[in-house]
Amino acid sequence: MSSEMAAKSVKAFGLALKDSSGLFSPFNFSRRATGEHDVQLKVLYCGVCNFDNLMRRNKYGRTKFPYVFGHEIVGVVTEVGSNVKKFKIGNKVGVSFIVDTCRECERCKIGQQIACKKAVSSDGFFETPGYGGCSNIFVADENYVILWPENLPMDSGAPLLCIGITCYNPLRRFGLDKPGVRVGIVGLGAVGHLAIKFAKAFGARVTLISSSPGKKDEAFQKFGVDSFLVSSNAEEMQAAAETLDGILDTVPVVHPLEPLFALLKPLGKLIIIGEPHKPFEVSAMSLMEGGKIISASTGGSIKDTQEIVDFAAEHNVVADVEVIPVDYVNTAMERLDKADVKYRFVIDIGNTFKSP
C-alpha cells in the first residue's frame, strides 16, 4: 500500500462487543483505505460461528474490545486497487478467517496458511488489529479473497467459508472423497450436517454416529445417511465394528475415542475436527491394532476455499441456515449457548444494517 493510501481511511460501522457484558451494539470505526492490492466489498451476509460466541465470552482469553466478529463474509466488490488483477467492481466475493500471512514460511508454502505464525485474521484473533465482517464494508488483500460462484446462494453459502472448509478439506486430504467409501460422521450439528452433505456429494456411504437416538429420523429423512449408530448402544456399535474407512469427529467436547477406533477398518482414519478444549486420552494399542490413524484438521488454504465453493455450486451443497436481522444478534448468541439453531445463523447485513 502506498504511503498516501495508508494515510487515508474509510468510515465503517458494525456491531461490536465493547466490554465484558457479552452484548453487541452499534459501533462506528475506520477501515484502511483500499490499497493497490486491495479489494473493498459491501458486505451482504455474514455467518455466525460458534467461535464468535466463544470470543464473546472470552473463552480463549484473547478477546480485545471493541470486538467486531465475523469471518464468513460474503458481499459485492465496490472498489479495487490499482494493481488488483483477480477482481472487478460488481464481482460477488467471499472472505474467510485468514486475511494475510507471511507468504514465505513452510506452512504457507504447503497451504497451511491458517497455521502461519504471522497470520492475520479477519477479526483480530491473532494479536493484530482487525474488525470482523459484521459490518457494512470490508477491505482485504485480493490474495485472500475468493470469487463467489454466480449460482451459489450467498446466505446459505456463507458458512462454507468456515465450517464448510472444516469438513470438506479432511475428506479430500484423507482420501474419503471417493464413491463407495464408507465414512462415519460423529455429531449432527453445524459442522456435522455439512460433513454429511459433502460426503454424500462425493458418493460416499455415510454413517451418522450420535449420542442422541432422537436424531435418527432427521438423519435419514433430511440428510439421507445410509446408516445410524447410537454411540451409547454397545450392541449397535459392536455390529458395526471395522466397517468404516474413515471418521470425521465433529464433537467439540472431550468424549471416548476407543469406541470410534473399533468402527474403523484396518488402516482406517479418525480425524478430529471438533476442537475440544481439553486433551483426549488415546490408547496407542487401539491404533496399533490394524494400523489405524488419528489426525486432526482445521480450515484450509485460500485455494482450498475457492475449490470448496466451486464444488458446492456444482453439487448444490449449502448449509441449513436461519437468516436473521442485525438486531437479532444478541438473541442469536444466547441461543448458541443452548445449541438452539438448525444449523447456522446468517446475518442479513445488506438489508437490515443501517448506519447508526
Curated annotation (Swiss-Prot):
UniProt keyword annotation of Transcription regulation present: no
UniProt cofactor note: Binds 2 Zn(2+) ions per subunit.
Pathways involved: Alkaloid biosynthesis; vindoline biosynthesis
Keyword Nucleotide-binding: yes
Pfam families per the UniProt record, alphabetical: ADH_N, ADH_zinc_N
Domain of life: Eukaryota
GO molecular function, one term: oxidoreductase activity, acting on the CH-OH group of donors, NAD or NADP as acceptor
UniProt EC number: 1.1.99.41
Binding site for Zn(2+) 1: 49, 71, 162
Induction: Up-regulated by herbivory.
Chain sites annotated for binding Zn(2+) 2: 102, 105, 108, 116
Cofactor(s) needed for function: Zn(2+)
Alphabetized CDD domains for the sequence: CAD1 (cd05283)
Keywords: Alkaloid metabolism, Metal-binding, NAD, Nucleotide-binding, Oxidoreductase, Zinc
Tissue: Expressed in leaf epidermis.
GO biological process entries: alkaloid metabolic process
InterPro entries noted in UniProt: ADH-like_C (IPR013149), ADH-like_N (IPR013154), ADH_Zn_CS (IPR002328), CAD-like (IPR047109), GroES-like_sf (IPR011032), NAD(P)-bd_dom_sf (IPR036291), PKS_ER (IPR020843)
Catalysed reactions listed for this entry: (3R)-3-hydroxy-16-methoxy-2,3-dihydrotabersonine + A = (3R)-1,2-didehydro-3-hydroxy-16-methoxy-2,3-dihydrotabersonine + AH2; (3R)-3-hydroxy-2,3-dihydrotabersonine + A = (3R)-1,2-didehydro-3-hydroxy-2,3-dihydrotabersonine + AH2
Entry's family note: Belongs to the zinc-containing alcohol dehydrogenase family.
Role: Converts the unstable imine alcohols produced by CYP71D1V2/T3O into 3-hydroxy-16-methoxy-2,3-dihydrotabersonine or 3-hydroxy-2,3-dihydrotabersonine.
Protein name as annotated: 16-methoxy-2,3-dihydro-3-hydroxytabersonine synthase
Taxonomic lineage of the native organism: Eukaryota, Viridiplantae, Streptophyta, Embryophyta, Tracheophyta
